[in-house]
């Protein structure tokens, strides 16, 4: 949905402002205090309101791409809500939203907003993009695996555990990723009636009923599994992010330093899985990271990737884009295909040496 981002500054002081073509994956790198987290915040604010913020420090404007006619009805259906009992619905209108947040909008105007999103960006964002944008940052990633309400199974799901509990395909996809990462099987435990909890089991459930049921066999199965709240912060952070991505199915995903709490190999795994999930042509992933392993995972996924290096020195901001075509050339060169080369993107200066012995001396 996001087509391009125009910044307020360019490659160097005095040059034309840089414009970033939004690929499925856009990675923001650079030293500390260069604006990586700030640009994610400004993207999120735009997706929620659709209006330009005069207080923006980095982003001048954001362009949106129209929704294709063949998937238009599917996109509308994805955010359409049923009227509550006694709630008045005007002719030709629908309720759109997510969870408790809802708007009554003209169906014709909604379709037009998705077909020509740049004509009325406020409508496009407030009616659609606001409900399809997810940000994962340091404030919420550990808490994503905490207990959630089971809700009324007769009503639409509006929390991630509720979605996974009802959708066998999504639940099994999350389980596959977690098993490949940690060697244990993620299951959803409904035996605390009215609540849903995540557990890690040494054995997979024999069938869906053993996982989703409350009969004696299901209770015993979950009792033998470890509550995920007893796992390490790295396991909880990784599981929470994967769960939210697959259950929420966002069109725009914003991740701020996803490598926090993770071993380098897990950072690589997360980058690869996230990029695979978000590689659909109409989805966009924006990441601010300090991890060359995460960046390498994104590249290894095969999804188109842009790397944007941000800097801020002596009150001068710069942005340099490493486009996907150049990244492919870099990765096809055996001498340059390493996380050591990518790690140079995160520093102010890089020293190139002849051998490992020289490198060790400078380190």
Located regions from the model:
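Short active-site oxyanion
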Residues: 162-163, 283-284, 348-350
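Conserved helicase/translocase motor-coupling segment
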Residues: 347-363
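P-loop NTPase switch/coupling surface
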Residues: 1-194, 362
